[in-house]
């Protein structure tokens, strides 16, 4: 999933940066968690170590491991899942739904040119009461005494004889959500939205500082992502780092790399990041250019400047060949190009400060051995918050100017998806105000008796259940109320 080839490109070009993500003392850093993406990664890691664990036991083991790290690093997770909190909602919005709806409407490329390119309105843009959240339980609602729920669907049909098989992932979805809710963690009922889309909404409404996921399509939606929280310095990818490296604006980035989205292009019809850049005759910055960019970042660290105005698209020329001219102009004038300093949450001293050459393979001083005055962290944190507020993506609708009129099914799918992303992340003007609707956040009252009941009901071995419960009580203390965390992080 994501943008095909983006992760490899980011690693190769040193765009994966390691950061401490240490907020000032007394603060929690809010982070959206694409729960199934993260849990699948952990399940693959741990289920081979514990082959005797059943689905619920391995799920709880991964959950305990994840919650312990969140507590250690003062991260405040807001969990986001596909198909709602009951794992039963059909997904009718997002990339997969757009592809399915478009291919059902158009059988041939000739039909695509006559079809409306607008996607259906999402719950975020719908002015009516959102039907996507109609099944949400009220805060503090407990499960019925006999409510055992149903387990997530098992693995699909077995692979043909002789075909390479992947190990079945032992992840109990509904059990995982119920434990998190009983422990009092904040969550989003994505309803009929994909989890990626809900995470992007939390990021662009300045609710979270990062999205914890390995899906690079969040970068296409303008988000900064965290790849792994278990390491000392956390590997991250900033969307603005990509834009500065590519020498392009966000609308250009969205319109160009939508071709790489794997969910929009079935049967390997997507383009890779390298292929798209090669078609545009893009060349990577030299080391001297990277050093100059780093010096500009340091010189401009106290004053953020706006990105240069885009050249208007030539009238009557709506093919992707115009990208070659645009990028050639930007590369030719790169000595005069002034990047904004990168936006990132407060980092710790001793971490990689040179944004141009930082690498995920660097040997860094462990964060716990680095002493930074709290006053310095507070100042850096305030600078980060001010920068995030100034850099709201207002120009996302300009991406449509860089797309040709859809003449094929693939182009129609891309056009609809770009419009859909714009509806998710671009604020709307309401008189003197610019507003972006945030999805509702829910947080049930912590009920340790309920959590214990859920665990012991599904994990029948008493010793295993007791061990996991002891880990939960030790490493997953009662989380703060999400409104207090967000107010302190963004408003103080």
Swiss-Prot record:
- Spell out the subunit comment: Interacts with human EIF4H, EIF4A1 and EIF4A2; interaction with eIF4AI and EIF4A2 presumably allows Vhs protein to associate with the eIF4F cap-binding complex.
Q: What is this protein called?
A: Virion host shutoff protein
What does the UniProt record say this protein does? Answer: Minor structural protein that acts as an endoribonuclease during lytic infection. Degrades host mRNAs in the cytoplasm by cutting them at preferred sites, including some in regions of translation initiation. Together with inhibition of host splicing by ICP27, contributes to an overall decrease in host protein synthesis. Also, after the onset of viral transcription, accelerates the turnover of viral mRNA, thereby facilitating the sequential expression of different classes of viral genes.
Lineage start: Viruses, Duplodnaviria, Heunggongvirae, Peploviricota, Herviviricetes
* UniProt enzyme class: hydrolase
**Which UniProt keywords are listed?**
Decay of host mRNAs by virus, Endonuclease, Eukaryotic host gene expression shutoff by virus, Host gene expression shutoff by virus, Host mRNA suppression by virus, Host-virus interaction, Hydrolase, Inhibition of host innate immune response by virus, Interferon antiviral system evasion, Late protein, Nuclease, RNA-binding, Viral immunoevasion, Virion
Q: Which organism is it from?
A: Human herpesvirus 2 (strain 333) (HHV-2)
Select a single GO molecular function from the record's annotations and give it. endonuclease activity
Query: Which residues does the annotated region (Disordered) include?
Result: 110-130, 288-307, 334-371
InterPro entries listed in its UniProt record: PIN-like_dom_sf, XPG-I_dom
Membership in a protein family: Belongs to the herpesviridae VHS protein family.
Q: Does the keyword Magnesium apply?
A: no
Q: Please indicate which residues carry the site annotation Necessary for the endonuclease activity.
A: 215
């Amino acid at each position: 999933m994501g943008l095909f080839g983006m992760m490899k490109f980011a690693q190769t070009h040193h765009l994966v940066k390691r950061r401490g993500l240490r907020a000032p003392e007394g603060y929690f850093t809010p982070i959206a968690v694409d729960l199934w993406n993260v849990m699948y990664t952990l399940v693959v890691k741990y289920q081979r170590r514990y082959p005797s664990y059943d689905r619920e036991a391995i799920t709880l083991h991964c959950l305990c491991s994840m919650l312990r790290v969140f507590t250690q690093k003062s991260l405040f997770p807001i969990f986001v899942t596909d198909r709602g909190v009951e794992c039963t909602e059909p997904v009718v919005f997002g990339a997969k739904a757009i592809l399915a709806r478009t291919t059902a409407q158009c059988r041939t490329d000739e039909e695509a040119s006559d079809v409306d390119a607008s996607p259906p309105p999402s719950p975020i843009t719908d002015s009516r009461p959102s039907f996507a959240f109609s099944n949400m339980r009220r805060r503090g609602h407990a499960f019925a005494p006999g409510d055992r729920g149903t387990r997530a669907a098992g693995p699909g049909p077995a692979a043909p004889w002789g075909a390479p098989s992947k190990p079945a992932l032992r992840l109990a979805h509904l059990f995982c959500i119920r434990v998190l809710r009983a422990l009092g963690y904040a969550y989003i009922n994505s309803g009929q939205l994909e989890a990626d889309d809900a995470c992007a909404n939390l990021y662009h409404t300045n609710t979270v500082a990062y999205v914890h996921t390995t899906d690079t399509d969040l970068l296409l939606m303008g988000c900064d992502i965290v790849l792994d929280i278990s390491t000392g310095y956390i590997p991250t990818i900033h969307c603005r780092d990509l834009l500065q490296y590519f020498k392009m604006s966000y609308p250009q980035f969205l319109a160009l790399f939508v071709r790489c989205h794997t969910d929009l292009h079935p049967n390997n019809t997507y383009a890779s990041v390298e292929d798209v850049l090669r078609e545009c005759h893009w060349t990577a910055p030299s080391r001297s250019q990277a050093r100059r960019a780093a010096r500009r970042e340091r010189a401009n660290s106290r004053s953020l400047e706006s990105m240069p105005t885009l050249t208007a698209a030539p009238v009557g020329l709506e093919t992707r060949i115009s990208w070659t001219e645009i990028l050639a102009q930007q590369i030719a004038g790169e000595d005069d190009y002034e990047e904004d300093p990168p936006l990132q949450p407060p980092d710790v001293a001793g971490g990689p400060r040179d944004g141009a050459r930082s690498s995920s393979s660097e040997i860094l001083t462990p964060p716990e051995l680095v002493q930074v005055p709290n006053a310095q962290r507070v100042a850096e944190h305030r600078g980060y918050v001010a920068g995030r507020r100034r850099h709201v993506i207002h120009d996302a609708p300009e991406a449509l100017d860089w797309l040709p009129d859809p003449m094929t099914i693939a182009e129609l799918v891309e056009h609809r998806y770009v419009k859909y992303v714009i509806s998710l992340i671009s604020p709307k003007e309401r008189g003197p105000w610019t507003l972006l609707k945030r999805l509702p956040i829910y947080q049930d009252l912590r009920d340790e008796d309920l959590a214990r009941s859920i665990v012991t009901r599904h994990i029948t071995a008493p010793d295993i259940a007791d061990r996991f419960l002891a880990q939960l009580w030790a490493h997953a203390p009662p989380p703060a109320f999400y409104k207090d965390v967000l107010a302190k992080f963004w408003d103080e």
